[in-house]
A protein has these predicted regions:
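N-terminal accessory/interface modules of nucleic-acid-binding and processing proteins
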Residues: 1-177, 182
C-alpha cells in the first residue's frame, strides 16, 4: 500500500480551531442547509449509534445528543456518508473507507475529537478496502480531497472558521470615548 508523508508545514498551518457549543450549533445549521441544497432531508432520531445516510429515502438520520457537539458529530457522519454515496464510483468497501475518512476530516475541521469508534471504523475499512482488487490509495485520496472541497464549499465550513478565527484575533472596534481615552494615554 502506498504511503503519503506530508512535511510538517503542510498540516501544522491548517490545525483545527477550537469551537464552542454555540459555534457547533451554527455548524449544525450550516450542514443541514447544505444537505437541503442537495435535496437531502435530515431527521433526528431518539436512538443511540452513529449518524447514517438512508439512500433509498434520501434522508440523513442523526441521533439526538446530550449536547451540540454530539449532534454535530452524528450529523457529520451522516453527511459524509451521503456525499460519498452520491459521488463514489468505487466498490462498497472503498466507499466505506472514504466515508469514514471524510467523517474524520470534517470532525477535525470542526474541532470535534476523533473517538476510538471512528478510528476503529477507519482501520477496519482500510483493511477491507485493501482486499478489493484494483484498490488505489492515491485514487481514494483524490476522491476524498474532492469530497472535502465539496463539503467545505457547500457547508461553508471554511468561511465559518475564518469568521470565528477573525473574531478571536481582531480586537473589538473602539468607541469614540475609548479612542479619546487612548489618545490621552
Amino acid at each position: 500500500m502506498e504511503q503519503y508523508d506530508l512535511p510538517e508545514s503542510e498540516y501544522l498551518d491548517k490545525a483545527p480551531l477550537q469551537w464552542t457549543e454555540a459555534q457547533h450549533s451554527d455548524l449544525i445549521h450550516r450542514v443541514e442547509d447544505a444537505a437541503q441544497l442537495a435535496d437531502i432531508s435530515v431527521l433526528s432520531d431518539l436512538r443511540h449509534g452513529t449518524g447514517f445516510f438512508d439512500a433509498s429515502r434520501n434522508v440523513i438520520h442523526i441521533r439526538e445528543g446530550n449536547n451540540s457537539t454530539e449532534q454535530l458529530k452524528s450529523l457529520l457522519e451522516g453527511y459524509s456518508e451521503a456525499v460519498i454515496t452520491r459521488t463514489s464510483t468505487s466498490d462498497k468497501p472503498v466507499a466505506e473507507l472514504e466515508s469514514a475518512a471524510l467523517t474524520a476530516l470534517l470532525q477535525v475541521r470542526c474541532g470535534v475529537p476523533i473517538d476510538d469508534q471512528l478510528a476503529e471504523r477507519i482501520t477496519a475499512a482500510l483493511e477491507d478496502a485493501g482486499n478489493v482488487g484494483g484498490f488505489s490509495m492515491r485514487d481514494s485520496v483524490a476522491r476524498l480531497h474532492n469530497a472535502m472541497e465539496y463539503c467545505v464549499r457547500y457547508a461553508e465550513l471554511e468561511q465559518t472558521s475564518e469568521q470565528y478565527q477573525a473574531q478571536q484575533i481582531e480586537p473589538e472596534e473602539l468607541t469614540p470615548q475609548s479612542e479619546a481615552f487612548m489618545e490621552m494615554m
